[in-house]
UniProtKB/Swiss-Prot annotation:
Family annotation (InterPro entries): I/U_nuclsd_hydro_CS (IPR015910), Inosine/uridine_hydrolase_dom (IPR001910), IUNH (IPR023186), Pyrim_hydro_RihA (IPR022975), Ribo_hydro-like (IPR036452)
Upper lineage: Bacteria, Pseudomonadati, Pseudomonadota, Gammaproteobacteria, Alteromonadales
Pfam families for this protein: IU_nuc_hydro (PF01156)
GO biological process, one term: nucleobase-containing small molecule interconversion
Keyword list, A-Z: Glycosidase, Hydrolase
Gene Ontology MF: a single term: uridine nucleosidase activity
Domain of life, per lineage: Bacteria
Record-listed E.C. numbers: 3.2.-.-
Gene Ontology cellular component list: cytosol
UniProt keyword Repeat, yes or no: no
Protein name (database record): Pyrimidine-specific ribonucleoside hydrolase RihA
Length: 318
């Protein structure tokens, strides 16, 4: 039985690869793709989702744009990481279809309402759309099986010393999500910084004879540029967002611990910090399954095997 999911993203190189990974597996049933501002401006992230789905010949998946800015803060984007388009590197096709007339929150609500099974939400950008959905559609909480998100860190941040980018962009939204009572899987920097793609992995991907693998290799060529800065101490480039999909497909690849996680929304120094209580020091009940470790080679093999699925026959099956 396939698991119904909604991908809420801000493409973004690693968002695009997460989307490509998800759509290679029939055990995941994407009901919709929604977008928010984050890695680039809202018009560009929406266009990028349409471009990736056009590449995959999946115009059957409804797409809607969502929040153009955080709940109560000014928009911040990561164009220094993802380039002018948000997906710099490959020559992607122009969109072959249009987004839905409704916004992201209403499309998510409609798909959750219509689903005969609980739906898993997979946000890989700022959590604004998810927070708005939870705040405006309390009647649907019971139909959300889990929120599998990329965001946060138990250790150091990547946008400030204390905060990871997605949470820092809209900490108030993250606070709503983590207080919702809905089961959460948190794929934070602790695990995603271990999910590094190396030069030799990119060459494995480039050798796969299909246009989707070629696109991913070229996305990774560009993504590598930012992460070669010696300050990070990386050998490769961390594939943050695909960890969410990899966990859904094979949770055995990961080491995890149930923890209480709180969001800092006030401090000047630590705004956007995810406070992860690994040692039950607060006495608060756990609200998230936090990923701390990954079988990196197993993760890379999953990605490579998934990209090999996208033969011309597979892409033209619809």
């Amino acid at each position: 039985m396939s698991r119904p999911i909604i991908l809420d993203c801000d493409p973004g190189h690693d968002d695009a690869i997460a989307l490509i990974l998800a759509l290679a597996h029939p055990e995941l049933n994407p009901l919709a793709v929604t977008t928010s501002a984050g890695n680039q401006t809202p018009d560009k992230t929406l266009n990028n989702a349409l471009r990736i789905l056009t590449l995959l010949n999946r115009s059957d998946i409804p797409v809607a744009g969502g929040a153009v800015k955080p709940l109560s803060r000014e928009l911040m984007i990561a164009d220094n990481v993802h380039g002018e388009t948000g997906l710099d590197g490959p020559a992607l096709p122009a969109p072959s279809f249009q987004p839905q007339a409704v916004n992201a929150v209403e499309l998510m609500a409609e798909k959750i309402r219509q689903s005969d099974k609980p739906v898993t939400l997979v946000p890989t950008g700022p959590l604004t759309n998810i927070a708005l959905l939870l705040a405006s559609h309390g009647e649907l909480h019971a139909k959300i099986e889990r929120i599998v998100l990329m965001g946060g860190a138990a250790g150091v941040g990547n946008w400030t010393p204390a905060a990871e980018f997605n949470i820092f962009v809209d900490p108030e939204a993250a606070d709503i999500v983590f207080k919702s009572g809905i089961p959460i899987t948190m794929c934070g920097l602790d695990v995603t910084h271990q999910a590094q793609i190396m030069d030799e992995d990119i060459e494995r991907i480039r050798a796969i004879p299909n246009p989707v693998a070629k696109c991913v290799a070229e996305l990774l060529d560009f993504f590598m540029i930012y992460h070669r800065d010696p300050k990070w101490g990386f050998v490769g480039a961390p594939l943050h967002d695909p960890c969410t999909i990899a966990w859904l497909l094979n949770p055995a690849l990961f080491d995890a611990q149930d923890c209480w996680v709180g969001i800092e929304t006030q401090s000047e120094l630590t705004l956007g910090m995810t406070v992860v209580d690994r040692y039950q020091l607060t006495g608060k009940p756990t609200n998230a399954t936090v990923l701390f470790g990954i079988d990196r080679q197993g993760f890379v093999d999953l990605l490579v095997d998934s990209l090999a699925v996208y033969t011309p026959t597979y892409l033209n099956r619809r």
